[in-house]
Amino acid sequence: PPNALMLCGVSIVDPDSTYVDDTVEVGPDTVIHANSHLCGQTRIGEECTIGPNSILVDTVVGDRCQVFASVLEQAVLEDDVSIGPFGHLRKGAHLATGVHLGNFGEVKNSYLGPGVKMGHFSYIGDAEIGAETNIGAGTITCNFDVKGRKNRTRIGKRAYIGSGTMLVAPVEVGDGAVTGAGSVVTRSVPARTVAYGVPARVHGTVEQG
């Protein structure tokens, strides 16, 4: 299969260390680096860079995406998404156009809207995140309660989630809202307000600074 892809305009840097199932589709002008595994019903668009050291299983990737040293399972990437190094997308992860997921970020059963930035050390599970929101380092959605139930987190557009924020689901953060570093959010945060503390409380609006 690597040789067949190369005949279709795909660049494979090291065919001997690249593993591609017969069922995989890859668009022209995509580059696949060494030690990459493309498995199952994976479909990759045009002008992407995959690897090195990446595993994609049953994953759909749009055009001009970058996946570096990461594992993607049953996920969807729209166009111009960048992941890695050491990112992990699990079943049901959907990253919209222009999303960036950096090192040691994990997403499961969640939608990240266009332009969302999630730079480092975060877990987003069972969540919906609006466009252009920034997820600070160490942010965690606490989605699994003591009764074994999975609960959802909803974050609006252009919100700013401070580093080390714990979002105890079910909870909602409104459009343009801000959470301070180290906050434990147990109650919903209204749009364009600032919340911080343990537990987090609203201390004013964004306009008030």
Predicted regions and their residues:
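Extended, small-residue-rich solenoid/repeat segments and analogous flexible loops
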Residues: 1-69, 77-85
